[in-house]
Amino acid sequence: MTKAGLHRSILQELVKNGEIYRFGRGLYVRSSAWEDDFYLLQRKYGRGIYSHDTALYLLGYSDRTPAKYTMTFPKGYNALSLKQENLTVKRVVPENYDFGTIEIEFPSGNPIRVYDLERTLCDILRGSGSDVQVVGEAMKRYAASKDKNIHKLMKCADQLRVKPKVLRYMEVLP
């Protein structure tokens, strides 16, 4: 904030008056503003990328609002405050971290980094813990979508080593 020409004492006064509140280190939010948790968490944890069930929701392939957001970080990233958040934390090897990252605009107008649909489908098939019904519905929607990119899905499945699982799902879908 000092870079923006705002002195710390002014920030403290605004917090004291209830006009803003501190969300995290260097992050302040107007008390009257709509709180965009997705954006704020990503600003707080800049290395986090929304993934798994949360990415499905953000991309419009799941109707279930996640009870806990899922973010993926590179292996070795260790922010102690992550444990205090309502987050499921996933870690991946550095060579797979940026693979399939896109930026979408949230309804609030804020940019959100999320894994693309093909990467997300592979991630949820790869791990455990995803609701079978959510996975099945997402795969059905993908198979019926005019925007599906099977070549990209298979390339992603190869890189993340889930090609047999992806093929099994794709074989049984119309």
Predicted features by range, described:
Residues 1-2, 55:
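A short acidic, leucine-rich amphipathic alpha-helix
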Residues 3-16:
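Short amphipathic alpha-helical interaction segments
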Residues 15, 23, 27-174:
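Nucleic-acid-binding surface
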